[in-house]
């Protein structure tokens, strides 16, 4: 829990206690999604199942506060990473159409001080262009960045 601030832990505790109606120090795993949403997180059902499987130590359908804080820390890290990826994508997607064209990629690379040929730009696009449209969409961009 060292990556969480004291304020975050206190906020999580307040919310956790509201869901711990019997005062056992535990919540039912089925309540996790609702609890997380009250704290501004919006995990998908699949993400919830993965988070529960990772955090639940004794597989009894309940989470204690420490397990819950671990889940929240992980979810917040992933949310931060997602936001950073979207911001990076926007830098490349200069016209905001949701795609990085060869011209946009070339512009950014040159502004970063990279000397790249048209062939190198085309190769970079080809490596990540899974749908074959000649441009890089957000999902392809994330894949490309995660390969580096």
UniProtKB/Swiss-Prot annotation:
Ca(2+) 4 binds at residues 129, 131, 133, 135, 140. Ca(2+) 2 binds at residues 58, 60, 62, 67. Disulfide bonds: none annotated. Residues 7-42, 43-78, 80-115, 116-148 form the EF-hand domain. Keywords: Calcium, Metal-binding, Repeat. Ca(2+) 3 binds at residues 93, 95, 97, 104. Ca(2+) 1 binds at residues 20, 24, 26, 31. PROSITE patterns: EF_HAND_1, EF_HAND_2. The keyword Metal-binding applies. One of its GO terms (cellular component) is nucleus. The keyword Metal-binding applies. One of its GO terms (biological process) is actin filament-based movement. May be involved in calcium-mediated signal transduction. Belongs to the calmodulin family. This is Calmodulin-related protein 97A. It comes from Drosophila melanogaster. The gene is Acam.
